[in-house]
């Protein structure tokens, strides 16, 4: 539903899944991603903190979503910290790491990471940005502008 653009239905089903199984950190993390896309990174971060309390040895999905929350909130240093905790880098963590590094003025390292992200994912910047379903144009352009500046 999220990828179909039906955010109302996605919210309903995520909240219902969490109601049915409140200790499922996967659903909590996916709900937090949805909240970030809707421009509510603070609410999303509350969900991530809850997931980490439930499982302190959390999955990479929780850490990746934590990094996304920090990026959308403009806390690029904390975003990097979250992505570095991950066991396995993902295309999402690589693109956001590159964007965070660029936002922090570390263009050289950002360029290296972006190259890896593009090669491993087979995606260019535009295709990756279009896969991020931000509803606020400012959130989408923040990511896009950082990646294009590299």
Predicted regions and their residues:
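Alpha-helical segment of the N-proximal tetratricopeptide repeat
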Residues: 1-3
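Alpha-helical protein-protein interaction modules
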Residues: 6-150
